[in-house]
Amino acid sequence: MLVHPQFDPVAISIGPLAVRWYGLMYLLGFSLFILLGRYRIRQQPNGVFTREMLDDALFYGVLGVILGGRLGHVLFYEPGYYLQHPLEILAIWQGGMSFHGGFLGVAIAMLCLARKYQLSWLAVTDFIAPLVPLGLGAGRIGNFINGELWGRPTDVPWGMIFPYADNLPRHPSQLYEFALEGLVLFALIWLYSAKPRPLGAVTGMFMIGYGAFRSFCEFFREPDDGFLGIMTLGISMGQWLSLPMIAAGIALLYWAYRYDGKPEKAARKLPRERKNRD
C-alpha cells in the first residue's frame, strides 16, 4: 500500500503571487503544443500550416480549453453547486476542468481559426490532433499532485491512500490516464499521422483513441457526480460523454477512407510567400 505524497499545491510563491502546480501543468501542455507543432511544420514544408497559424492555434485553443473545459465541468459534473456559488465558476486555479467540455471548446475555436485562414476545419484539426495528448497527460499529473480524481478502492499492491478521500487504498487512476491518454495516445496518433492520411482520418483516430482509453480508465476511477447521477445503467459520466465521441470518431474515420478526402483538395492553397515563412 502506498500513501499519496500530499504535495503542496503551490509550486512557486513570490509575495502575494502563488503559482500552482496545476497551472504549471497547463503551461507545460501549451509549451509542448508549440514545440511539437513547429517540428511538424518543419517536417511538412509543403503543408497548409505555418508558424503564424500555429501561434494563432495556441491562442484560440487556450480560450477553447479554458472556457469549454470550465463550462463543461460546471454543466456536466456540478451544476447544483455552481448554481449556489456562481462566483466559484471563475476560480479555475482551484481545479475543475472537463476534457469533454474542453474538446468542444477547442473544436469551436479551431472552426474559427479555419474560417480566418480559409481552410478546411478538418485540415486544421488533423494537424493539431497529434499535439494534444502530451498536454492531456500533463493535466493528469496536475490532478495527481492535487490529490483529486482518485480511483476506486482496491487491494492491488500499488493502491494508494489519498489525503482527501477515506482511508481506503485506491487506484491511482490519474497515473493510468497519464499513461494511456497521454503517452500511449500520443505515440499512436503521432505515428499514425507520420504518413499522409485522408482528410479527417487523424481527427477521427484521436477521437476513437481518447474515448476508448478514457472509457477503460473509468473502470478504475471513482465515478464523478453529474446531472445524470454518479452511475446510470452502470456507466459513469466519463463513459457517457466518451461514447458519442467514439461513435463520431468511427463515423469520421469511415467517411475519410470512404471518400478518401485529401487535405490539398479540401483546403484552399495559401500564397507561396506565406508557405515559405517557416
From Swiss-Prot:
It comes from the Bacteria. The keyword Coiled coil does not apply. Pfam families: LGT. GO terms for cellular component: plasma membrane. It is an enzyme of class 2 (transferase). Its EC number is 2.5.1.145. It is found in: Cell inner membrane. PANTHER family: PHOSPHATIDYLGLYCEROL--PROLIPOPROTEIN DIACYLGLYCERYL TRANSFERASE, PROLIPOPROTEIN DIACYLGLYCERYL TRANSFERASE. Catalyzes the transfer of the diacylglyceryl group from phosphatidylglycerol to the sulfhydryl group of the N-terminal cysteine of a prolipoprotein, the first step in the formation of mature lipoproteins. Belongs to the Lgt family. This is Phosphatidylglycerol--prolipoprotein diacylglyceryl transferase. It comes from Nitrosomonas europaea (strain ATCC 19718 / CIP 103999 / KCTC 2705 / NBRC 14298).
